Swiss-Prot record:
This is ATP synthase subunit delta. GO terms for molecular function: proton-transporting ATP synthase activity, rotational mechanism. The lineage of its organism: Bacteria, Pseudomonadati, Campylobacterota, Epsilonproteobacteria, Campylobacterales. Belongs to the ATPase delta chain family. F-type ATPases have 2 components, F(1) - the catalytic core - and F(0) - the membrane proton channel. F(1) has five subunits: alpha(3), beta(3), gamma(1), delta(1), epsilon(1). F(0) has three main subunits: a(1), b(2) and c(10-14). The alpha and beta chains form an alternating ring which encloses part of the gamma chain. F(1) is attached to F(0) by a central stalk formed by the gamma and epsilon chains, while a peripheral stalk is formed by the delta and b chains.
Amino acid sequence: MNEVVAKKYVKAILSDVNSAQLAKFISNLSEISAAFEIEKFRNIISLPTLKNSAKAEFILSLVQDPSENFKNFIKLLGANKRLSLIPAILNEIKSEQTLLDNIYHGSVYGNFELNGEQLSALEDKFSKRFDAKVKLGGSKSDYNGIKVELDDLGVEASFSMDRLKTQMSEYILKAI
């Protein structure tokens, strides 16, 4: 439910700002969203005795030099009792920005560490394949092989050592 409402706010934001303003908007939302990690802050925002306008002003005090659009946006969220949606709006606006910039993030899993050179080679190959900028982050896991996941593109490529061994065994048995 929150994601649906957040998408509507993001759509309105994107229709009203240019790319430079969008970067500032995301920066401001990131500052506020970081505050939502603190339990006391969430308690203050959810206090029913505190007026929504006071909550909006409190949130705006966390941001240095907010634009008029940003002030109006936070006041609108406060008036509609939707200030708790700020982290969801930030996540949604970041994903929309990556779509606009044609940048996709993914992960590489394997039972060994990939160095920066190997990661950049994979990024280049996937970038050419999908005609988009691909950024990959590597992590070591228990997966016996290598797996590349690009969630935004809906792509998963993997090479499993166990599967290779099984297929080779089957091929040898068929040949006999």
